[in-house]
Swiss-Prot record:
Its EC number is 2.7.7.7. Keywords: DNA replication, DNA-directed DNA polymerase, Exonuclease, Hydrolase, Magnesium, Manganese, Metal-binding, Nuclease, Nucleotidyltransferase, Transferase. This is DNA polymerase III subunit epsilon. Binds 2 divalent metal cations. Magnesium or manganese. A divalent metal cation 1 binds at residues 23, 25, 167. DNA polymerase III is a complex, multichain enzyme responsible for most of the replicative synthesis in bacteria. The epsilon subunit contain the editing function and is a proofreading 3'-5' exonuclease. One of its GO terms (biological process) is DNA replication proofreading. CDD domains: DEDDh. It comes from Aquifex aeolicus (strain VF5). It holds the Pfam family RNase_T. Its cofactor is Mg(2+); Mn(2+). A divalent metal cation 2 binds at residue 23. The gene is dnaQ.
Length: 202
């Protein structure tokens, strides 16, 4: 039986293949009560970032002060920006059927799921990998595993963190480091092996 394109991607060494890293900022952490205000994705092909998607999103109401301080995003910046309903089709087209990577990716996917169910009537079903879980397994000696702390450990520039495009770019760079470490030490780099490692079964 012929394999589907998606199953082939999932068996590829991701250092040679294609994946998309996503990140978002929202008005809060409760998915049902919060809305996305900053959405980004970067496509990685053969270990190189080849394309980027980024947009601010108008949430429909004023954002909390703590979110302004965290992200640097203000209400004035969001006025006149597209709504999530307007940007969702372009975002989903950019992501395609690729493997999705994120730092604490489960939270991002919960938000995307909320919107795909609301506006598309279906769940977001792309396979996913979490750099937070993988970094804990691959680099066990780090003191902290926030995106900023991991990035600084590798000498990456972290000015502008907590903006979606910056965070997605840093996550991509960290994931490439994880893939390189796993490939050179253990000869693994496919989705299924990484998923087992996430779950502590490697």
């Amino acid at each position: 039986m012929k394999s589907s394109p998606k199953s082939l991607k999932m068996r590829d060494n991701l250092l040679d293949g294609t994946f998309v890293v996503i990140d978002l900022e929202a008005t809060g952490f409760d998915v049902e009560k919060s809305e996305v205000i900053d959405l980004a994705a970067v496509r990685v092909e053969g270990g190189i970032i080849t394309e980027k998607f980024s947009t601010l999103v108008y949430p429909g109401y004023f954002i909390p002060e703590r979110i302004k301080k965290l992200t640097g995003i203000t209400n004035a910046m969001l006025v006149g920006q597209p709504t999530i309903e307007e940007v969702l089709p372009e975002f989903l087209e950019f992501v395609g059927d690729n493997i999705v990577v994120g730092h604490f990716v489960e939270q991002d996917i919960k938000f995307i799921n909320k919107y795909t169910k609301q506006y598309r009537g279906k769940k977001f079903r792309n396979p996913s990998l979490c750099t937070l879980k993988l970094a804990r397994k691959v680099f066990p000696g780090l003191k902290k595993y926030s995106l900023k702390e991991i990035a600084e450990n590798f000498g990456f520039e972290t000015n502008g963190v907590h903006r979606a495009l910056k965070d997605a770019t840093l996550t991509a760079e960290i994931f490439i480091k994880i893939l390189e470490e796993l490939w050179f030490k253990y000869g693994i780099g496919d989705y299924y092996s990484l998923k087992r490692l996430e779950k502590g079964k490697f």
